[in-house]
Amino acid sequence: MSQGKIVQIIGAVVDVEFQRNEVPKVYHALKVEGTAITLEVQQQLGDGVVRTIALGSTDGLKRNLLATNTERAISVPVGAGTLGRIMDVLGRPIDEAGDVQASDHWEIHRAAPSYEDQSSSTELLETGIKVIDLMCPFAKGGKVGLFGGAGVGKTVNMMELINNIAKAHSGLSVFAGVGERTREGNDFYHEMKDSNVLDKVAMVYGQMNEPPGNRLRVALTGLTMAEYFRDEKDENGKGKDVLLFVDNIYRYTLAGTEVSALLGRMPSAVGYQPTLAEEMGVLQERITSTKSGSITSIQAVYVPADDLTDPSPATTFAHLDSTVTLSRNIASLGIYPAVDPLDSTSRQMDPLVIGHEHYDTAQRVQQTLQKYKELKDIIAILGMDELSEEDKQSVSRARKIERFFSQPFHVAEVFTGSPGKYVSLKDTIRGFKAICDGEYDHLPEQAFYMVGSIEEAVEKANKMSAKA
């Protein structure tokens, strides 16, 4: 193993000089002697000097310290030993529960599965959240993005999906916390512990307070652990079905921007790194399903200033099967989850995949909401009285649909005081079809707010009329 010495330190960037015939390769990990710091080689500058990014604080580093080349990329523990544990970007435990007992270590930089090994699935994944199941259904083994600005409920939606899918799903889950709040990571750990599914979840965190190198690589660490579960075959030659949760993919891009600037690259549009599309592709192309096992990934995507055309969310869109767009306007009406049914999409929205009844109901709901959206300007200027009877009926049904899309969440029980509701896909389709058919035109729209199935709305309406 070759050794070099540190010649320059600028923030998180460390230059190390080696003998010219022993220069480490790009992405090789270097260990700094006498410290716990790992450096990752990013560039070869010539004359034996390599430029590296520190994975950890550079406090206490000084020139002439020795750095040893490990001659391989960062390797992290994989396998059953990671379940129930919280680890950092290097796979070191941060939950004070002793060492991670792993039989194997995998490098975090890996090639994506070849085209012939990949498989696509059209099997639906039921989430129990009405608006998602109806308007932008998820595919098993697909990629889902939760898009939203600050404070519209990305993390709460993700926690509810974890609650509904990970608990019902008998397989394994990996949670990668990329540049998010430490408190949320802590809440997630206790949530999993209280619901007795901690032994099926591996958690990897590189939170907001950590250097950019950690935040850039932690998504790859979590993905590597998920890939192991997918690819490790049992006695029947089958891998596992894994759920991968990433919160937040925007922070991965942001860390890439910071690293790019530190390395002195020219910025591109809006100050992002010139390699934005490639960096996103390197991560997303590996999140895929193969013939032996599947990775279903749910990623939260922060939208800066609510601008979906920003290069970061715009680049992410291309890689996803379903997009769930959270809207500030809907949140301001008090409708949660604040999913915009007209802006959310899914590749599964095809009658041959989801069935004609589901497809037709979703289309009718969309048409009713679109008509209401177009009539809003007229209503604002002239009022409801100027509308035709048919338009009044459409507006009334659209407002009921909007309210029926709201739903109490299990993870928000502590705040709202109302118990969470899981609504099956069959009940969801039946409820919305009945509203579109006008079966509930006689009920007040308030009855549809924050209920589960359509029967609960009828029951709520009866209670309201009894009180009146």
Swiss-Prot record:
InterPro entries tied to this protein: AAA+_ATPase (IPR003593), ATP-synt_VA_C (IPR055190), ATP_synth_F1_bsu (IPR005722), ATPase_a/bsu_AS (IPR020003), ATPase_alpha/beta_chains (IPR050053), ATPase_F1/V1/A1_a/bsu_N (IPR004100), ATPase_F1/V1/A1_a/bsu_N_sf (IPR036121), ATPase_F1/V1/A1_a/bsu_nucl-bd (IPR000194)
GO CC annotation terms, alphabetical: plasma membrane; proton-transporting ATP synthase complex
NCBIfam families: atpD
Subunit structure comment from the entry: F-type ATPases have 2 components, CF(1) - the catalytic core - and CF(0) - the membrane proton channel. CF(1) has five subunits: alpha(3), beta(3), gamma(1), delta(1), epsilon(1). CF(0) has three main subunits: a(1), b(2) and c(9-12). The alpha and beta chains form an alternating ring which encloses part of the gamma chain. CF(1) is attached to CF(0) by a central stalk formed by the gamma and epsilon chains, while a peripheral stalk is formed by the delta and b chains.
Annotated protein name in UniProt: ATP synthase subunit beta
Catalytic activity: ATP + H2O + 4 H(+)(in) = ADP + phosphate + 5 H(+)(out)
Main location group: membrane
Cross-referenced Gene3D superfamilies: 2.40.10.170, Bovine Mitochondrial F1-atpase, Atp Synthase Beta Chain, Chain D, domain 3, P-loop containing nucleotide triphosphate hydrolases
Keyword Translocase assigned: yes
PROSITE patterns the record matches: ATPASE_ALPHA_BETA (PS00152)
Binding positions (ATP): 148-155
Function as written in the Swiss-Prot or TrEMBL entry: Produces ATP from ADP in the presence of a proton gradient across the membrane. The catalytic sites are hosted primarily by the beta subunits.
Compartment(s): Cell inner membrane
Entry similarity comment: Belongs to the ATPase alpha/beta chains family.
GO terms, molecular function: ATP binding; ATP hydrolysis activity; proton-transporting ATP synthase activity, rotational mechanism
Enzyme Commission number: 7.1.2.2
SMART domains in the cross-refs: AAA
UniProt keyword annotations, A-Z: ATP synthesis, ATP-binding, Cell inner membrane, Cell membrane, CF(1), Hydrogen ion transport, Ion transport, Membrane, Nucleotide-binding, Translocase, Transport
Listed HAMAP family: ATP_synth_beta_bact
Topology in membrane: Peripheral membrane protein
Presence of the UniProt keyword Cell division in the record: no
